[in-house]
């Protein structure tokens, strides 16, 4: 349908609920399609003989339900199904610096670990959390979490964040996200009908003043990356974590989720951002970056109520995480080789990232964030599409930063470069190429 579709599709009703239901029926039958505009509030109110506040309330109900979205001057339109971005597959024809994958040579030997497992088949009704993994989690989390907690296991960090938000929020609730933001988090927020509000990130992490403003505006949850923020690579300093705790202490009802996805191989210590006053909180640690992306496991420490809510969604006999997978993960984590393996990965990624940043600096390309992990964020104030296309033509695949920016983002556009396998000669060649591209586009 065209933008005039709603004029031909009869919307009826005299109450906000009836009007909202009428529009939903039109969408359900295909008479209104994604992108179609509904009539302006005043126009529909006149047509139906109701007060414009009634129509405005109906439209708010549609937005909260995820059926419609506001488009500024375009008014209210039927919403499309949100697109949830993911990491790209490695491009074999180009030098792959876009996929976000770790270096396979720095991952442990999974086949050897499998051979050591004393696995016994688990039946319906078995424990949802592998006892050995739960014990490892308690030993690991207890020195860093000064609060009573329970242990849950989810299908990775993205799964954990989604389950936590869905367990505590309702459609239309406001969620504070870092800006720029890990695309999976913003996609999860959109997909579940929540509203994202961006909070800027600087060289020390999440801006506490902006966070306070967002919480004052009604945010009911905040997702924080304490180490190796994606895409910038920033880790919270001790002082910034203290400032964030101080702010959050005044909002004990807010759900605080810390996504510590790079934990075992980060070059920085963990600084807790969750205050003691938080009633609803979770610390999530996945294993994809240091054990391998195919091991879809995250260990979650959370307050008991949140753990119980997660448990209802990860029930034994229904949606639990495979105990075989859990046993494999804890076998790898507790192996004699683990500490050395993680230390080698930590050092290698640090050297590769630092080398790339130094080569970029030599070409006048700024990387303003102190970077941990294996990705480097390069701001491109004049847009990211042209640099991405130019590098691709020259044989380099980098990640366009667009998906990391929410609709209300104030962050600079940028590109993300995965340096996990980058050699020094490659870093120099890439820096020279990117420097030339950015100089040409800035003129």
What are these regions (language model features)?
Residues 283-360, 367-368:
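PLP-dependent aminotransferase class I/II
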Residues 1-123, 135, 139, 315-322, ...:
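N-terminal basic, amphipathic alpha-helical segments
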